[in-house]
From Swiss-Prot:
InterPro entries on file: Asxl_HARE-HTH, RNAP_delta_N_dom_sf, RpoE
HAMAP family tied to this protein: RNApol_bact_RpoE (MF_00357)
Stretches that traverse the bilayer: none
Entry function: Participates in both the initiation and recycling phases of transcription. In the presence of the delta subunit, RNAP displays an increased specificity of transcription, a decreased affinity for nucleic acids, and an increased efficiency of RNA synthesis because of enhanced recycling.
Keyword Nucleotidyltransferase: yes
Start and end residues of each stretch annotated as Disordered: 93-177
Gene Ontology MF term list: DNA-directed RNA polymerase activity
Chain coiled-coil ranges: none
Compositional bias annotation for Acidic residues: 106-177
Pfam families tied to this protein: HARE-HTH (PF05066)
Keyword tags: DNA-directed RNA polymerase, Nucleotidyltransferase, Transcription, Transferase
Keyword Transmembrane belongs to the record: no
Protein name: Probable DNA-directed RNA polymerase subunit delta
Amino acid sequence: MDFKQYSPEELKECSMIEVVHSVLGDKKQATTFNELVQEIAQVLGLSQEQVNAKIAQFYTDLNIDGRFINLGENRWGLRSWYPYEQIDEEILPQPKPKKKRKVEEDGFDDYIEEDEDDFDDVDGNEDEDDDVEDLDKVLEDEDGDDDDLDDLDDDEDDFAEEELEYDETEEEEEEEL
């Protein structure tokens, strides 16, 4: 679209999105956002202050408008230039093929099931027997502690009975006096 044929009044009525669509249509190639903003400012005769005031809304409109596509690295193009299948290819970075390495022998590939069974069937493990004996001793000691508690309870009961007997004998002696 040739913007020279329009009067300045007609250009002021054009939106920034319409101008960008025309600019990209004329160029027929993707352009960076900054270049698009500079061309819009030149075509519409906008000052830097006016551009700074409108740039956020322009970027939002550019994203929302379905006619434009962001190709990455801040480059914009017309969606009509890219068939749907090609969009992913253009936008996504292409993976680099990886070099194949020689497989090194590490010795871990030879797994023998017999080795695993040997660990379960080990006889004569004296450490385990010692541990069981130690546990038995601990349990016996704890049982002994319970016996001590029972003895204490019995002692308390005996003391209480003796105290009652003492109190009774004391009362009898007082009555005799």
